[in-house]
Amino acid sequence: MTEEIAGFQTSPKAQVQAAFEEIARRSMHDLSFLHPSMPVYVSDFTLFEGQWTGCVITPWMLSAVIFPGPDQLWPLRKVSEKIGLQLPYGTMTFTVGELDGVSQYLSCSLMSPLSHSMSIEEGQRLTDDCARMILSLPVTNPDVPHAGRRALLFGRRSGENA
């Protein structure tokens, strides 16, 4: 019988915040690279393809995180396993983690360690901005010429004679 991780019917923001605050209090407080005044902050979570997606900043890192969503059953995975996911922002590599009392989750480090010059407000704004960016559709200029497939195969660029 395989174990499965049940999804969250509502946003896990409060549980994630409490779990990271406990980690900060219990085991991270004496590390030399910690941002001295950055509190744990969790962005709002957004449902994307059935999964809860957001970002978290702590005194030691800023990460994108994904938790199982409503009616989801994730297979139990090995902590530290790597998984590549295609998000609107692009392909990102996530690592399986586990928060005591919460769930397994996927995490992609965006910044570690944090700059000590970053204010609390800047850190929280950056966390919210990153949560929006990873789910933002990429914008391109349709008037910019693109190299065709043949040009890519044969080393030619747009505008060169074939």
Curated annotation (Swiss-Prot):
Species lineage, top-down?
Bacteria, Pseudomonadati, Pseudomonadota, Gammaproteobacteria, Enterobacterales
InterPro entries annotated for this entry?
Answer: NiFe-hyd_HybE (IPR023994), NiFe-hyd_HybE_sf (IPR038530)
Identification of the protein by name: Hydrogenase-2 operon protein HybE
An annotated GO BP: protein maturation
Q: Which organism is it from?
A: Escherichia coli (strain K12)
- Pfam families the UniProt entry points to: NiFe-hyd_HybE
**Gene Ontology MF annotations:** preprotein binding
Family of this protein? Belongs to the HupJ family.
